[in-house]
Amino acid sequence: MTSTINKHLDGEGSVQVKQDPKVNIEEGALVIAVYGKGGIGKSTTSSNLSAAFSKLGKKVLQIGCDPKHDSTFTLTHKMVPTVIDILEEVDFHSEELRPTDFMFEGFNGVMCVESGGPPAGTGCGGYVTGQTVKLLKEHHLLEDTDVVIFDVLGDVVCGGFAAPLQHANYCLIVTANDFDSIFAMNRIVSAIKAKAKNYKVRLGGVVANRSKDTDQIDKFNDRTGLKTMAHFKDVDAIRRSRLKKCTIFEMEPTEDVIEVQNEYLSLAKNMLENVEPLEGTPLKDREIFDLLGFD
């Protein structure tokens, strides 16, 4: 007895969208996309980096690109409504919205937006990122922005992965000094290299996070042509700042806190003045497996 299996196109029945090439962020703004293994500290890094840019006198917009919508709460001190939720309330008639419905001011004037995402298993994260940028442009909210930071979910290398890369100048990859994080970073490098053929985005460098040492990261950088732009050790004040729902710049200025603050300020300054586009050559899975570890 034979059975007939109906085959469907990948994504059929899901919320899908093609990115509109006309929906771009104005030239002049520095646009950074932050990637990395899930749970590595991208939102912490993004929020503190946004705060650092604001400390340098820049007008900053942070866009959280994760259905968990927890990218900006240390800036706003609360969980803000997502763009997709707000659009659903008005049946996707964006002309009915006001900027205050979906954009919120956080620490030191940093403007915050959470794109949100479709229900699990029903679509692509790139859809809501594209809709978010479109909405911001419709309301002329990007015209006076100096820095835009996209905080992107996990290390998913799919169609939605390309949405922030359509707009970004540079990509920062957050990693720890361990195999899993660096393995994920290698996959992200591969994806960015592929997308860079069509978009202006380039690799900006590596952020070593929650790591006392960087020996494994250094090995990877030496082989692939990447560069560590900042190193944040496993400082308990960073963990406590998340629990306090604030940035590291709002914590009591202990020696450890001041060191972290200065590292973020240095990273922000380098991204503005001293960043060099990196080519980056990803390794094959077997090569990275053999590279990392102790001799």
UniProtKB/Swiss-Prot annotation:
Residues binding Mg(2+): 43
Listed InterPro entries: NifH/chlL_CS (IPR030655), NifH/frxC (IPR000392), P-loop_NTPase (IPR027417), Protochlorophyllide_ATP-bd (IPR005971)
Q: Known catalysed reaction(s)?
A: chlorophyllide a + oxidized 2[4Fe-4S]-[ferredoxin] + 2 ADP + 2 phosphate = protochlorophyllide a + reduced 2[4Fe-4S]-[ferredoxin] + 2 ATP + 2 H2O
Q: Which PROSITE patterns match?
A: NIFH_FRXC_1, NIFH_FRXC_2, NIFH_FRXC_3
Residues binding ATP are 39-44, 68, 209-210
Q: Name one GO biological process term.
A: light-independent chlorophyll biosynthetic process
Sites where the protein binds [4Fe-4S] cluster: 124, 158
Cofactor(s) this protein requires: [4Fe-4S] cluster
Q: Which Pfam families match?
A: Fer4_NifH
Instruction: Give the cofactor note.
Output: Binds 1 [4Fe-4S] cluster per dimer.
| Gene3D superfamilies in the record | P-loop containing nucleotide triphosphate hydrolases
What SUPFAM superfamilies does UniProt report for this protein, alphabetically?
Answer: P-loop containing nucleoside triphosphate hydrolases
Q: In which pathway does it act?
A: Porphyrin-containing compound metabolism; chlorophyll biosynthesis (light-independent)
Q: Which GO terms describe its molecular function?
A: 4 iron, 4 sulfur cluster binding; ATP binding; metal ion binding; oxidoreductase activity, acting on iron-sulfur proteins as donors; oxidoreductase activity, acting on the CH-CH group of donors, iron-sulfur protein as acceptor
Coiled-coil region: none
Q: How does it assemble?
A: Homodimer. Protochlorophyllide reductase is composed of three subunits; ChlL, ChlN and ChlB.
Which family, according to the similarity comment?
Answer: Belongs to the NifH/BchL/ChlL family.
* Protein's job: Component of the dark-operative protochlorophyllide reductase (DPOR) that uses Mg-ATP and reduced ferredoxin to reduce ring D of protochlorophyllide (Pchlide) to form chlorophyllide a (Chlide). This reaction is light-independent. The L component serves as a unique electron donor to the NB-component of the complex, and binds Mg-ATP.
Q: Under what name is this protein listed?
A: Light-independent protochlorophyllide reductase iron-sulfur ATP-binding protein
Which species is this UniProt entry from? Prochlorococcus marinus (strain MIT 9515)
Q: What is the lineage of its organism?
A: Bacteria, Bacillati, Cyanobacteriota, Cyanophyceae, Synechococcales
